[in-house]
Each structure stands twice: as C-alpha cells, then as structure tokens.
C-alpha cells in the first residue's frame, strides 16, 4: 500500500502542512480541499494516483495541521491562498502541475490558472463542484453558499468522537462517503481535542472572514483567461454549483463537464467511477 509522507514547510511566513504521495520525479498533481476541510480528504484519490503521479495535498492555513493566522482579516482570502499555493510549488521546485480542487480549492485553481503571471503553472484543472460565480444574482444568494455561511464561523463542540462523526454524517451527507471506515477516517482527520476535553472540527473559526472578501466569489474574468484543459465535476443535486452556472461554464471550448448522480456538494472523489473520470482526464 502506498503511504503518504507528512511534511511541514514555511511558505510566505506561514507554516503549511501537506501530505506527499508518490515519486517526486513524476508529474505533480496538487489536490486542494474545500473551505473547512483539509488535505486528507483526498487520501483515497491520492493513493490511486500515486502510482503514476507525485501528489501534494496541502492543508490551507487555518485548517488541519497548518498554522492559524494572527491576521485573519487579511490572510483568510483566496488571493493569499493562491499566493501560498504558488509559494509551495516554488519552494518544492515544481514548475507545472495538474490541479484537483474541491469547492474552495477549485476557486484557488481558477485564480492561479486565470492569472497571466501564473496561468502556465497549471496544465490540467479539475474543478469539483465549484463555479466561477453566479449567473444573475450575487454569489452570496446561492443556497449552498448561504448554508455554508450560516455555520462556518461557529464550529460545534461535542463531548465524543461519535457525536462529531454523526454531525458530519448530517452536514456532509451529500459527499457520498460509502462506508463506516470512510466516515471514521473523515472524522479522525477533521477533529481536535479542546482544552475542556471536548472535541470539535479542526479549523480556525475566523476562516469565516473569507466572506468579507466578496470579490473572491466572482471569478468570471479569471475563468475567461484560463488556457488549461478543464474538467468541471458537478454533484447532480448540488446547491453550491447551480446548473445554469455549470452550463455557462461548459460553453468555454476547453471545458468539459460531468455530473455525478445522486450526490451534492461536493463529491468525495472516492469511488472507482469518479477516480476513473479523473485518471482519464489527467493523462
């Protein structure tokens, strides 16, 4: 079985944790997680891809084992996350990479691939259930975005691991985790013990300040500038990537879209079918 290495590096003055899979001499795939999540969400996918690729799965600052910011109003935004991603690639001497981004991780990928200074850094861009903005109204009016805003700044507290796992089974029901072991792993890598002995999700509540940076949520200009090959994955019942936005994005000549039946925001990329779609696109 392929096992990851756990690494900590200082990038732009912040300590960033990431898991590293496979041979660094092979082509690199960066897997970047969603808003409150962490790099271990990609363990199943990374284990499969590591036969052919070098895989990096970072924890964004404020999540997982990466450092929490002392200046959250400034640091918790897509622009800074994009700069950290470029800084990590530079630090590791990686000129180009394939990119798999779930939700926020996809938005970061759009920013990088759609910025003239960096657009050659990403050759293949996979966006997992995230759009470039809204079609008509403000992004904040999208039902799934409103749902996320309602809870992200106040992570719940529980006494036991089981209670937290049951909570995750509720709010992440549409991810498509398929068995109890996957839920155990998902919860284990997403929790921390509190000073009072309780347990809670492992992220800085201040990451909710992201939503003060409303410009981060409108990425249409960057979207139009992307030259990379693009695969847009949409959960069939997603409330974060509306169908009309996905259809608009699919009109871009270098973008193809697939829909994952019965799943919402965001597919866990954990099944043979989903992994096969990704493997075929990355080739």
Which residues make up each language-model segment?
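Alpha/beta-hydrolase fold catalytic core
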Residues: 1-30, 51-53, 94-95, 123, ...
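Conserved HGGG/HGGXW glycine-rich cap/lid loop of the alpha/beta-hydrolase fold
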Residues: 14-68
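Active-site loop/oxyanion-hole signature of alpha/beta-hydrolase fold enzymes
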Residues: 44, 57-100, 104
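Short glycine-enriched nucleophile-adjacent loop
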Residues: 106-117, 125
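Flexible "cap/lid" loop of the alpha/beta hydrolase fold
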Residues: 123-161
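Conserved alpha/beta-hydrolase catalytic His-Asp/Glu region
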Residues: 155-213
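Conserved serine/cysteine hydrolase catalytic core
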Residues: 192-250
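Catalytic histidine-centered segment of alpha/beta-hydrolase-like enzymes
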Residues: 263-273
């Amino acid at each position: 079985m392929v096992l990851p290495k756990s690494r900590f590096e200082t990038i732009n003055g912040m300590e960033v944790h990431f898991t590293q899979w496979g041979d660094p001499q092979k082509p690199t795939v960066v897997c970047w997680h969603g808003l409150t999540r962490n790099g271990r969400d990609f363990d199943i996918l990374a284990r499969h891809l590591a036969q052919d690729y070098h895989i990096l799965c970072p924890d964004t600052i404020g999540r997982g084992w990466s450092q929490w910011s002392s200046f959250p109003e400034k640091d918790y935004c897509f622009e800074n996350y994009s700069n950290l991603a470029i800084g990590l690639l530079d630090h590791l001497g990686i000129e180009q990479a394939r990119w798999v981004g779930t939700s926020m991780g996809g938005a970061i990928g759009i920013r990088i691939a759609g910025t003239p200074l960096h657009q050659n850094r990403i050759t293949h861009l996979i966006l997992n259930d995230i759009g470039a903005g809204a079609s008509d109204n403000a992004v904040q009016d999208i039902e799934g975005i409103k749902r996320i805003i309602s809870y992200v700044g106040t992570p719940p507290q529980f006494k036991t691991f089981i209670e937290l796992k049951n909570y995750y089974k509720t709010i992440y029901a549409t991810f498509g985790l398929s068995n109890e072991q996957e839920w155990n792993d998902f919860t284990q890598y997403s929790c921390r013990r509190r000073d009072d002995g309780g347990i809670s999700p492992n992220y800085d509540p201040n990451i909710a300040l992201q939503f003060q940076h409303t410009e981060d949520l409108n990425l249409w200009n960057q979207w139009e500038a992307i030259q990379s090959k693009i695969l847009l994955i949409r959960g069939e019942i997603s409330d974060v990537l509306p169908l009309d936005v996905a259809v608009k994005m699919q009109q871009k000549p270098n973008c193809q879209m697939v829909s994952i039946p019965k799943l919402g925001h965001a597919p866990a990329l954990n099944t043979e079918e989903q992994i096969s779609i990704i493997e075929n696109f990355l080739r």
